[in-house]
């Protein structure tokens, strides 16, 4: 048998799992080309030598109310790996851990499990600092409007802070090319601001272009609020830190995004019989497992599609892009969100356009090019250990046994002695180049 070791269970029961395949099968795993994990000495050096700014210990001198913005459980950033070094910098500036507020950037993601959050931030910081979990529905303050017309409602802690720094990561995003940088600000905004950003700007689809209006808008918000210092991490398929940028994110962000594109590039699964995507390290819930599904969306219609994810939070939650809804409800919800951010004249133009278009004779559907539903369900392998149940999902077959998956492959390809298997070990980190607009992933 051929054995492949992967990780699963981010934040809750992070562990190794083993996938076994018959020796005759053609199994290829597309591992990312990441460097070795950083040592303590390397992390300390990069924090002490930030890009375009003095060290944090100098920025923090004389400050009384610093805020550290960190991404939430929906992101795999191992904040605990660098938080001890950050606290040392504050201590060198004369600040105690008790003086520091850690603001968790949840966006519209809702509740955060306290035990998992303590593990992400690190127990010492979680116990000593004041940890505040952001709510997009309350506790925000209007701080202005961007040049794009986005009203900015930020967490009320930010206008009161005399120093704001961020800790986040750079992960592929269909909205801004990559996350991280100024996009970390989105997680500490009010619902109106977040809705406007998502539904006023077009995403970049299957490309990784960071030169887009969505990113320009969130970067402008970061400047407006004063989050000018961010520590940006890259991780490998085991959630170990392999790269760290710190300091002026406006300067270094293009380089950080280029690192992601270069190191995590993987080929398309063009000729695969079976495409297997491990959603770790974003397998916290089905909502965010979907961030890993680009190889699934790029696979041929006849390929067997398998996603791996523990999903300890079950279906999960997203205030704008909730999973598990019927197609009609999802369609109406998106329509409401889009209309809610339009200017009155734009709404009027669309109404007039619709009225005129209805007078045209109906166009017969092109049966040749019509998109038909998949012939087979996507398999979702949920390794044992997760306790939160998940509802039945249309077009998805959930299994908890790897043996059942292998049996399913054998039944699907009974005449093939050498089944062509292609594995993406950390799908939410990996980059696949496809034509713009072909891939429309789920929300943040």
Residue spans for each PLM region:
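Glycine-rich phosphate/diphosphate-binding loops that line cofactor/substrate pockets in enzymes
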Residues: 51-67, 92-98, 266-273, 299-300, ...
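Active-site segments that bind and position negatively charged phosphate/pyrophosphate groups
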Residues: 250-315, 319, 336-339
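Short glycine-rich or small-residue beta-strand-to-loop segments that form or flank ligand, phosphate
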Residues: 65-76, 101-107, 275-278
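An acidic, phosphate/nucleotide-engaging active-site surface
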Residues: 112-178
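N-terminal amphipathic/basic leader segments beginning at the initiator methionine
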Residues: 1-47
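Divalent-metal (Mg2+/Mn2+/Ca2+)-assisted nucleotide/phosphate chemistry catalytic cores
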Residues: 150, 154-213, 218
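C-terminal non-catalytic interaction/assembly regions of soluble proteins
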Residues: 91, 292-444
């Amino acid at each position: 048998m051929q054995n492949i070791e992967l990780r699963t269970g981010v934040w809750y029961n992070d562990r190794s799992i083993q996938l076994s395949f018959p020796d005759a099968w053609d199994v290829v795993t597309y591992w990312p080309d990441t460097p070795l994990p950083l040592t303590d000495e390397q992390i300390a050096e990069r924090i002490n030598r930030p890009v375009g700014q003095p060290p944090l210990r100098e920025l923090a001198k004389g400050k009384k109310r610093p805020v550290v913005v960190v991404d939430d459980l929906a992101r795999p950033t191992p904040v605990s790996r660098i938080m001890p070094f950050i606290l040392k910098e504050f201590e060198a500036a004369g600040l105690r851990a008790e003086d520091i507020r850690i603001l968790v950037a949840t966006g519209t993601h809702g509740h955060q499990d306290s035990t998992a959050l303590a593990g992400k931030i690190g127990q010492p910081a979680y116990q000593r600092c004041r940890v505040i979990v952001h709510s997009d529905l309350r506790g925000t303050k209007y701080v202005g409007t961007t040049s794009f017309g986005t009203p900015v409602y930020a967490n009320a802690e930010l206008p009161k802070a005399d120093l704001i720094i961020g800790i986040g990561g750079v992960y592929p995003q269909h909205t801004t090319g990559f996350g991280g940088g100024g996009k970390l600000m989105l997680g500490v905004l009010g619902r109106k601001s977040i809705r406007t950003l998502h539904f006023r700007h077009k995403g970049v689809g299957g490309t990784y272009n960071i030169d887009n209006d969505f990113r320009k808008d969130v970067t402008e918000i970061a400047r407006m609020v004063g989050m000018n210092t961010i520590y940006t991490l890259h991780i490998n398929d085991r959630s170990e830190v392999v790269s760290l940028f710190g300091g002026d994110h406006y300067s270094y962000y293009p380089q950080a995004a280029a690192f992601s594109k270069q190191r995590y590039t993987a080929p398309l699964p063009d000729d695969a019989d079976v495409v297997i995507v491990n959603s770790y390290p974003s397998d916290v819930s089905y909502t965010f497992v979907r961030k890993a599904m680009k190889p699934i969306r790029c696979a041929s219609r006849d390929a067997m599609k398998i996603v791996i994810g523990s999903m300890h939070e079950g279906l999960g939650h997203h205030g704008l892009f909730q999973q598990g809804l019927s197609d009609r409800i999802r369609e109406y919800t998106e329509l409401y969100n889009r209309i809610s951010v339009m200017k009155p004249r734009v709404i009027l133009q669309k109404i007039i356009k619709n009225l005129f278009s209805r007078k045209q004779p109906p166009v017969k559907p092109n049966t040749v090019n019509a998109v038909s539903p998949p012939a087979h369900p996507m398999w979702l392998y949920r390794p044992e250990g997760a306790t939160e149940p998940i509802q039945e999902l249309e077009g998805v077959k959930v299994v908890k046994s790897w043996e059942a998956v292998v049996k399913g492959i054998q039944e699907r390809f009974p005449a093939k002695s050498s089944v062509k298997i292609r594995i993406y070990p950390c799908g939410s980190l990996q980059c696949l180049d496809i034509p713009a607009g072909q891939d429309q992933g789920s929300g943040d």
